[in-house]
């Protein structure tokens, strides 16, 4: 692990109860780390995981990194104060989104496991940036291997049985999303975020009862 400190942090106002996963969305890992360490950027993350699995530590866990922005999850409106932010090097949808290499996923999995164990974080609170800011963000995206985390009990699995309830409605679905944790002020954005994570092969924003 490499220590590369960012000046962009503050004091937490909430205990750590979440992990928020991002992709860097820049053309290289070095560019992303430079940006996160730049005072002018006003953004940061606790950790960056490069494509070769190298782990970079940028903000101490007890401090509030600036990674989630305007966000909401399960009643928390200051996700930065409640979370550990992990940036995963990937060009993202703007610069050539691609699968996450095995070495990178191995490091992400080990890091998440350690943080879950250290802070007693519930798997429901291991989330993506798109989960907490669905109207603004789409990372870590549909190629991220959530199933790898879920198999280890580090994140929530997608239900294995699909039910189409004759009494199902858009309002029922959005209410279920809200109970799960999503902010539903923008219902379609929340639906897309849910699909991106749990039905990544068909992200159409349609509420179809699946």
Regions picked out by a protein language model, each given a short descriptive name:
Residues 77, 92, 97-185, 189-210:
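Basic/polar, cationic surfaces and motifs that engage anionic cell-wall
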């Amino acid at each position: 692990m490499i220590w590369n400190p960012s000046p962009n942090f503050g004091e937490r106002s909430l205990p750590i109860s979440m992990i928020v996963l991002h992709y860097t969305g820049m053309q290289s890992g070095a560019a992303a780390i430079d940006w996160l360490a730049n005072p002018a950027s006003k953004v940061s993350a606790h950790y960056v995981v490069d494509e070769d699995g190298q782990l970079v530590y940028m903000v101490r866990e007890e401090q509030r990194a600036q990674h989630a922005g305007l966000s909401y999850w399960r009643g928390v409106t200051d996700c930065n104060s409640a979370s550990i932010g992990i940036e995963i090097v990937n060009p993202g949808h703007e610069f050539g989104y691609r699968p996450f290499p095995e070495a990178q996923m191995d490091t992400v999995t080990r890091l998440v496991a350690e943080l879950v164990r250290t802070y007693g974080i519930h798997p429901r609170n291991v989330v993506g940036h798109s989960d907490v800011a669905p109207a603004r963000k789409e990372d870590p995206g549909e190629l991220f291997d959530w199933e790898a985390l879920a198999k280890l009990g580090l994140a929530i699995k997608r239900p294995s049985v699909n039910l189409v309830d004759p009494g199902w409605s858009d309002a029922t679905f959005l209410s279920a999303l809200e109970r799960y944790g999503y902010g539903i002020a923008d219902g379609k954005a929340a639906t897309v975020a849910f699909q991106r994570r749990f039905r990544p092969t068909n992200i159409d924003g349609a509420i179809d009862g699946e």
